[in-house]
């Protein structure tokens, strides 16, 4: 990690301010080259000397750690580039644990590129994606759970997600994992006692204690894994599928919710043959709303593919909007929609009776359970019901924020369940082996056991400058 790295830490583009970030042992010296007021006098010397000589030839400027200093920036030919607020973070009290210098410059591609080019010419290297965070991890400035929380917060698209992820950033997930690991280690200690003193008299209830500890830990792992999977909508957007038979107004509802015309609306049944997906912000939540092909029996092979996609969308959705036509009598196609809903009892289902501005002919069960709307006139009630439902959900507590974390917990749970079966068979050595797998998987949430492979995979998904 001796190389000094540089990247733009803010979003690229035109804006008020851009931040160029340097990290490494030569960060301060490289900054001095840009800031030195005598650059014009040293123009000839600078143009012929190597980057390492330039670093050595300039004295370190008097940047006070954690203070903002207004400086002028010059290129290697002594030409003025920009005024910058420069902040120096002295090692080890910085994000990466190394010397960091940040240049707050005027925003825009041109200035960013000018400053970056000068720093690279003088010896810095462009940072790889996530390299600043990777250095922070390697220098023990953060653990993996915190690094993933930072990345998830950056990518989060709802206030609810940001609030939960802030808890992970604050260390709640790591503390939970440490406590869980201690419980599994405690179970391991009991097992090793049984193995080491197999010929001695042991308490009669020791196997019961092991079994109870094992069951408790399996329950904890299963709960957090299931809760985290059900809350993926907080990070990715809650999937809302609009389903119904053809020509009930599904596309009209989509267009009305989006407040622009996204789907083709026609009196001809079967107009929508492929799923249409759009993002929609409702309150503090991101919604991924999906319009689907009308579900019916069809001889058209292309339409049947669309219908299969509709059923798949319902299966994958967090919330289903089931739409029926108030102006048409209840028929076998509507009955088919009810059959699909019967298999989705674990989801929020909102039944909608559309076209209430026309003569009412639809009759099916308790119509009080339907939202009665006219998509042509107003769909605000749908937005309100969705917002009220999501606001009523309990999103408190710990959440696994990445697929890597969910996989680690899932693998740990599987290992403990295998261990449970081995305990019943009195295979204590194999039982201990499975416990070791679980311990490693749980600990990998904040400290991986396959270090290089996991770090490379994880940090490569981070943005540049982070």
Curated annotation (Swiss-Prot):
Its main location: cytoplasm. One of its GO terms (biological process) is tRNA methylation. GTP binds at residues 247-252, 266-272, 291-294. It holds the Pfam family TrmE_N. Its EC number is 3.6.-.-. (6S)-5-formyl-5,6,7,8-tetrahydrofolate binds at residues 21, 102, 141, 466. One of its GO terms (molecular function) is GTPase activity. PROSITE patterns: G_TRME. Binds 1 potassium ion per subunit. Its cofactor is K(+). Belongs to the TRAFAC class TrmE-Era-EngA-EngB-Septin-like GTPase superfamily. TrmE GTPase family. Homodimer. Heterotetramer of two MnmE and two MnmG subunits. Exhibits a very high intrinsic GTPase hydrolysis rate. Involved in the addition of a carboxymethylaminomethyl (cmnm) group at the wobble position (U34) of certain tRNAs, forming tRNA-cmnm(5)s(2)U34. NCBIfam families: mnmE_trmE_thdF, small_GTP. This is tRNA modification GTPase MnmE. The lineage of its organism: Bacteria, Pseudomonadati, Campylobacterota, Epsilonproteobacteria, Campylobacterales.
């Amino acid at each position: 990690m001796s190389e000094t790295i540089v990247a733009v830490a803010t979003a690229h583009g035109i804006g008020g301010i851009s931040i160029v970030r340097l990290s490494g042992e030569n960060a301060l010296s490289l900054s001095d080259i840009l800031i030195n007021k005598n650059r014009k006098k040293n123009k000839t010397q600078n143009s012929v000397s190597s980057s390492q000589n330039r670093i050595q030839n300039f004295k370190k400027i008097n940047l006070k750690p954690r203070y903002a200093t207004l400086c002028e920036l010059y290129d290697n030919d002594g030409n003025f580039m920009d005024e910058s607020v420069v902040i120096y973070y002295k090692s080890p009290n910085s994000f990466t644990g190394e010397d960091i210098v940040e240049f707050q410059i005027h925003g825009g591609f041109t200035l960013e590129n000018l400053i970056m080019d000068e720093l690279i010419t003088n010896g810095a290297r462009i940072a790889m994606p996530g390299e600043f965070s990777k250095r922070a991890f390697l220098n023990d400035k953060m653990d993996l759970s915190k690094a993933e929380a930072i990345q998830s917060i950056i990518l989060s698209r709802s206030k609810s997600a940001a609030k939960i992820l802030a808890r992970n950033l604050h260390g709640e997930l790591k503390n939970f994992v440490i406590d869980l690991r201690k419980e599994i280690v405690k179970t391991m200690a009991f097992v090793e006692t049984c193995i080491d003193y197999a010929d001695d008299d042991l308490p009669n209830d020791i196997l019961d204690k092991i079994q109870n500890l094992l069951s408790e830990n399996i329950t904890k792992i299963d709960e957090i894994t299931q809760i985290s999977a059900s809350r993926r909508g907080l990070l990715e957007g809650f999937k809302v599928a609009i389903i119904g038979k053809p020509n009930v107004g599904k596309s009209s509802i989509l267009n009305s919710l989006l407040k622009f015309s996204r789907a083709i609306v026609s009196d001809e049944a079967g107009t929508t043959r492929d799923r249409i997906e759009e993002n929609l912000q409702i309150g503090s939540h991101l919604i991924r709303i999906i319009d689907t092909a009308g579900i019916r029996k069809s001889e058209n092979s292309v339409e049947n593919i669309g219908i299969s996609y509709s059923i798949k969308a319902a299966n994958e959705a967090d919330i289903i909007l089931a739409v029926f036509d108030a102006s048409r009598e209840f028929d076998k196609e509507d009955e088919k929609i009810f059959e699909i809903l019967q298999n989705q009892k674990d989801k929020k289902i909102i039944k909608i009776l559309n076209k209430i501005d026309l003569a009412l002919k639809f009759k099916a069960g308790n119509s009080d359970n339907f939202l009665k709307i006219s998509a042509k006139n107003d769909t605000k009630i749908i937005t309100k019901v969705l917002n009220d439902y999501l606001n009523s959900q309990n999103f408190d507590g710990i959440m696994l924020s990445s697929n890597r974390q969910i996989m680690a917990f899932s693998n740990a749970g599987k290992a403990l369940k295998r261990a449970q079966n081995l305990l019943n068979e009195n295979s204590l050595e194999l039982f201990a082996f499975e416990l070791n797998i679980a311990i490693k998987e749980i600990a990998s949430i904040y400290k991986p056991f396959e270090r290089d492979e996991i770090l490379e995979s994880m940090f490569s998904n981070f943005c540049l400058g982070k």
